[in-house]
From Swiss-Prot:
The keyword Lipid biosynthesis does not apply. This is 5'-nucleotidase SurE. It catalyses: a ribonucleoside 5'-phosphate + H2O = a ribonucleoside + phosphate. It comes from Bradyrhizobium diazoefficiens (strain JCM 10833 / BCRC 13528 / IAM 13628 / NBRC 14792 / USDA 110). NCBIfam families: PRK00346.1-4 (NF001490), surE (TIGR00087). It is found in: Cytoplasm. It is an enzyme of class 3 (hydrolase). InterPro entries: SurE, SurE-like_Pase/nucleotidase, SurE-like_sf.
Length: 255
């Protein structure tokens, strides 16, 4: 089995080495194509107005001056064009990708691009806490990742579906199990705008997160709840975002 690995944290990110280890537990035919620079939060952006620069950094390891989406396209269509991958793994992201993160995440976008190309694809993310921010518990992803991939691949993944896996911020021995979840929802106040001043007293801004707003009790059955309760969260996400339940009412309103 040929596996293509990517991420959004960049070619030198620790989590990329972890996802490669997970991939090598399944196959010896592993290729890495990742962004030259950190692309966190770029979502599913595609580089149309800038050229892509490709750099070989080692055997079967390539850096692309572009987004995770660009990397998957370059990997599947150019680098591995004569023999495309059988599986795409995106991650392991430093930090969880749950709830509204799904919309912003370059990690999930890398997996979604694999799904668009008709390839089984997983997004993998390792949650961290305030205490473990500088040293996330990567061993949790290493421990549970390979077995989850094997079982899901054996069961088969429907078309236009990407599997979003989030590992809780605890040691492997403290994980209570695995849950299949749905996408959660945070308090609407979780984003903040932080205004600062530069040396010339001109304003500039950072978008950040209000941790207190993110600590609300999440709904049962969600990715947020699973992580809080120390379970691995496995969420099947659909590429098709059509709200079919609203289609009939929408049609009636437009008559």
């Amino acid at each position: 089995m040929r596996i293509l690995c990517t991420n959004d944290d960049g070619i030198h990110a620790p989590g990329l080495k972890v996802v490669e280890e997970i991939a090598r537990a399944l196959s010896d035919d592993v290729w890495v194509v990742a962004p030259e620079l950190d692309q966190s939060g770029v979502s599913h952006s595609l580089s149309l107005n800038d050229p892509l620069r490709l750099r070989e950094v080692g055997p079967r390891h390539f850096a692309v001056r572009g987004t995770p989406t660009d990397c998957v396209i370059m990997g599947a269509r150019h680098i591995l064009g004569t023999k495309p991958p059988d599986l795409v793994l995106s991650g392991v992201n430093k930090g969880r990708n749950v709830a509204e993160d799904v919309v912003y995440s370059g990690t999930i976008a890398g997996a979604l691009e694999g799904t668009i190309l008709g390839l089984p694809s997983f997004a993998l993310s390792q949650e961290f806490s305030v205490e473990t921010r500088e040293r996330p518990p990567w061993d949790t992803a290493r421990t549970f990742g390979p077995d989850i991939l094997r079982k899901v691949m054996a069961a088969g993944i429907p078309k236009e579906t990407v599997i979003n896996v989030n590992f809780p911020s605890c040691a492997p021995e403290d994980v209570l199990g695995i849950r299949v979840t749905r996408q959660g929802k945070r308090n609407l106040g979780f984003l903040r705008i932080d205004e600062r001043r530069d040396g010339r007293n001109n304003p500039y801004f950072w978008i950040g997160f209000e941790r207190a707003a993110m600590m609300d009790t999440p709904a049962e059955g969600t990715d947020l709840a699973a992580l809080r309760e120390r379970y691995v969260s496995v969420t099947p996400l659909r590429l098709d975002r059509t709200n079919e339940a609203f289609s009939e009412a929408l049609g009636a309103a437009l008559k």
